[in-house]
Amino acid sequence: MRFLEVTENKKQYLDLLLLADEQEDMVDRYLDNGKMYVLDDNGVKCECVITDKENDILEIKNIATVPEYQGQGYARALIEFIVNNYREQYAILQVGTGDSPLTIPFYEKCGFVRSYIISNFFTDNYDHPIYESGIQLVDMVYLQRTI
């Protein structure tokens, strides 16, 4: 298993990025300014884009695993890689996600706790309704973890 920083042609992973953020113009808002990493285990299995938020906060803007490899620990391994490589520079790792029964428990298992909510984020910022597990995402839930 290798963790590789992607510095050029990040859009080659667009299909994977769109699994976590299904509107391309929203991905474009952070892709160029963010640092991108992929987890390669006999092929790319997972990607993550992080940005410098402010005040010692590093934010996961996008993390996604190839569907057939989900549930095998790749995203968790990539999060731990980020934590281990950025703990000297940042105090907090933060992630914003929809209030979904799939994503919230995953992040909580990775040591994140709920921090705050941005009401109506998905309805105000996306040009179409976003659904996960049959539930329309409305609010953005931010979770944080000390690193």
Q: Residue spans of the language-model regions?
A:
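Conserved N-terminal entry element of GNAT/NAT acetyltransferase domains
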Residues: M1-N9, V141, I147
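Acetyl-CoA-dependent GNAT
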Residues: L4-P67, I79
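Short hydrophobic/aromatic beta-strand or adjacent loop that forms the aromatic wall/cage
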Residues: G34-M36, L137-Y142
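Short acidic/polar active-site loop segments enriched in Thr and Asp
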Residues: D56, A91, V113
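Conserved acetyl-CoA pyrophosphate-binding loop and the N-cap/start of the following alpha-helix
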Residues: Y69-F81
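Conserved GNAT acetyl-CoA-binding A-motif
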Residues: N85-D99
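Conserved catalytic-core motifs of GNAT/GCN5-like acyltransferases
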Residues: Q94-G96, E108, V113-G134
